[in-house]
């Protein structure tokens, strides 16, 4: 609202009016001022900069995530296999705080984003191969670019089973105190308790919402151990230290993990094209080193 408009409005207020009338004039002037400010802001060629819902824009980090870092995540939405085409975007949520070597972390609920690389139907049946690549991790502060392989995948029901206590717990006791069996066979002895593998060897500890364990090789299923001997505690959520392959999904196969060419692209084979990937399906990603020839 311009100065001359305020003066004109003031002239309309009767001189010597009682307090109630004066108060109404003041309120009217305030409302007119707000309207004028809004109109001027809308017309400005340089409107105020918008920000993300988190409160500020994430910073694109130039540092790379360490090769071998495990990323436990859950699929956000149910997806029909027949709807998956090249370029289809998929989004996951990180399900446990992921500690980084520099004492930083990727926080729980960070977004893992990827896309369908290709979808190829079987020539001799109703099956289909879906190739996927996950290349971005986003949270309120950071935006990591990365390349990942797929170490393990588990159905929503397998996740539920891993979160179900082995024995009943007392009423009122926190669910995290219960003993549970991780996907792959490790036993988690509650929050703060040890995690032991099938050979009863201690591999880590239970923490709020998951586990921190030393990743183990699973040669029979095709998974390696720690990369270059860098064996540190990693966040695996509901998965065992040697979890590898497909759990609870009978008609799904991991036909290419993404550790070999094409690195960073993994392929799931579905026996029928009318199948679905349910919301809540768990994925265990692993950061890989993208060969120079594949870098864009």
Please report, for each region that a protein language model flagged, where it lies by residue.
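Contiguous beta-sheet cores, especially beta-hairpins with glycine/small-residue-rich turns
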Residues: 46, 50-296
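Signal peptide processing junction and immediate N-terminal pro/mature segment
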Residues: 36-49
């Amino acid at each position: 609202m311009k100065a001359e408009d305020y003066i004109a409005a003031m002239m309309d207020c009767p001189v010597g009016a009682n307090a109630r009338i004066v108060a109404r004039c003041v309120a009217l002037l305030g409302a007119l001022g707000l309207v004028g400010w809004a109109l001027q802001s809308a017309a400005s060629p340089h409107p105020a900069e918008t920000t993300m819902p988190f409160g500020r824009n994430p910073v694109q980090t130039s540092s790379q995530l360490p090769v071998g870092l495990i990323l436990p995540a859950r699929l956000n939405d149910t997806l029909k296999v027949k709807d998956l085409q090249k370029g289809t975007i998929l989004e996951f949520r990180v399900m446990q705080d992921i500690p980084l070597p520099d004492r930083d972390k990727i926080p729980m609920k960070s977004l893992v984003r990827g896309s369908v690389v290709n979808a190829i139907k079987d020539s001799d049946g109703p099956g289909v191969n879906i190739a996927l690549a996950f290349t971005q991790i986003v949270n309120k502060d950071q935006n990591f670019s990365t390349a990942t392989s797929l170490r393990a995948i588990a159905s929503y029901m397998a996740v539920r089973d891993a979160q179900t206590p082995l024995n009943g717990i007392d009423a009122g006791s926190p669910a995290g105190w219960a003993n549970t069996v991780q996907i792959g066979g490790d036993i988690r002895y509650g929050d703060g308790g040890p995690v032991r593998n099938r050979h009863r060897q201690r591999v880590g500890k239970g923490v709020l919402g998951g586990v921190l364990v030393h990743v183990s090789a699973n040669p029979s299923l095709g998974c390696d151990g720690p990369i270059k001997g860098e064996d540190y505690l990693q966040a695996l959520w509901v998965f065992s230290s040697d979890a590898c392959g497909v759990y609870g999904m009978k008609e799904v196969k991991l036909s290419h993990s993404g550790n070999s060419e094409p690195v960073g692209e993994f392929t799931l084979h579905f026996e029928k094209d009318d199948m679905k990937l349910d919301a809540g399906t768990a994925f265990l990603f692993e950061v890989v080193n993208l060969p120079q020839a594949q870098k864009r």
